[in-house]
């Protein structure tokens, strides 16, 4: 079954690029034609690139990786938060803070501070403080939640990033490339394809387009999580022997290894028949005795 259909792409306006005067010549190979001063993206290529990106994301997550969803423009914020939350992945929908990836150790300390403030609020620690102190803590917590709330459970840099609009998120893309983190992103006609490892040519300005492609990536994450869970169950379900089988006795195991011989049977074996000559002598003796 196809990840997404041509009809879905058309209905979401994925094929609409930017005006012809606002384009990156490197995107020429992804452009189908020009109509009314707007470039039309080749959706046949988009379909193949979607499959490629889908497989990469699925395999990454299946092997224990995480994908960071990034989209701070208004058209992408809702889809980024909704789809990332659906599959339990971190996301950034507000302003990207410089160093979120390259200086993650410092960011992680701020995440710990956010959790500390949440703990104070839950345990009622603010009640023993003055109103001014309570206000300061409340504002600090709100600010941290707004900027770092989407990555609050992220304990290390992600295995890959999904980006809506690489031009707007150029700082995030630059940090990912600096750390060697694969970038999966929508490539509009004004973007630089050299910055992206797994491009998906398409419209990054329309709400429906960004939502559709973000959902596709989230579906890939979901498939990867299912594959990971299946592999874990398979590993746990490998018994050394079948549940209903009795274990082999030690002498049986020795026979399998080619050591020793089987022990004598417990039942008494019948006596061997005497040789013909001995039998004849016994008969003569018996006759003599009788006489």
UniProtKB/Swiss-Prot annotation:
Keywords, alphabetical: Ribonucleoprotein, Ribosomal protein
S-S pairs: none
GO cellular component, one term: cytosolic small ribosomal subunit
GO BP, sorted A to Z: translation
Keyword Calcium: no
Keyword check for Ribonucleoprotein: yes
Region (Disordered) location: 256-291
Protein origin, superkingdom: Bacteria
Biased composition (Low complexity): 261-291
GO MF term set: structural constituent of ribosome
HAMAP family, A to Z: Ribosomal_uS2_B
Matches recorded under PANTHER family: 30S RIBOSOMAL PROTEIN S2 PROKARYOTIC AND ORGANELLAR (PTHR12534), SMALL RIBOSOMAL SUBUNIT PROTEIN US2M (PTHR12534:SF0)
Family membership noted in the UniProt record: Belongs to the universal ribosomal protein uS2 family.
Protein name from the UniProt record: Small ribosomal subunit protein uS2
Native organism: Frankia alni (strain DSM 45986 / CECT 9034 / ACN14a)
Gene (UniProt): rpsB
């Amino acid at each position: 079954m196809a990840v997404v259909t041509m009809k879905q792409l058309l209905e979401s306006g994925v094929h609409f690029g930017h005006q012809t005067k606002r384009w990156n010549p490197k995107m020429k190979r992804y452009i189908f034609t020009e109509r009314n001063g707007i470039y039309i993206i080749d959706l046949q290529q988009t379909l193949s690139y979607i499959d490629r990106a889908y497989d990469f994301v699925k395999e990454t997550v299946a092997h224990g990786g995480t994908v960071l969803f990034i989209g701070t423009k208004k058209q992408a914020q809702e889809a980024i938060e909704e789809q990332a939350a659906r599959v339990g992945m971190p996301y950034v929908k507000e302003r990207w803070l410089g160093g979120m990836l390259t200086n993650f150790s410092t960011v992680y300390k701020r995440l710990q501070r956010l959790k500390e403030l949440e703990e104070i609020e839950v345990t009622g620690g603010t009640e023993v403080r003055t109103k001014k102190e309570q206000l300061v803590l409340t504002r600090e917590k709100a600010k941290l939640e707004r900027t770092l709330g989407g990555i609050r459970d992220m304990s290390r840099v992600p295995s890959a990033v999904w980006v809506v609009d690489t031009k707007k998120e150029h700082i995030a893309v630059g940090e990912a490339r600096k750390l060697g983190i694969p970038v999966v992103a929508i490539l509009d006609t004004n973007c630089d394809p050299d910055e992206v490892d797994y491009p998906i040519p398409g419209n990054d300005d329309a709400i429906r387009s960004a939502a559709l492609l973000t959902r596709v990536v989230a579906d890939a994450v979901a498939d990867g999580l299912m594959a990971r869970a299946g592999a874990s169950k398979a590993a746990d379900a490998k018994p050394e022997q079948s549940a209903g089988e009795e274990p082999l006795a030690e002498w049986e195991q020795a026979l399998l290894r080619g050591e020793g011989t089987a022990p004598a049977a417990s039942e008494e074996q019948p006596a061997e028949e005497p040789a013909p000559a001995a039998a004849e002598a016994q008969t003569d003796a018996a006759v003599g005795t009788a006489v």
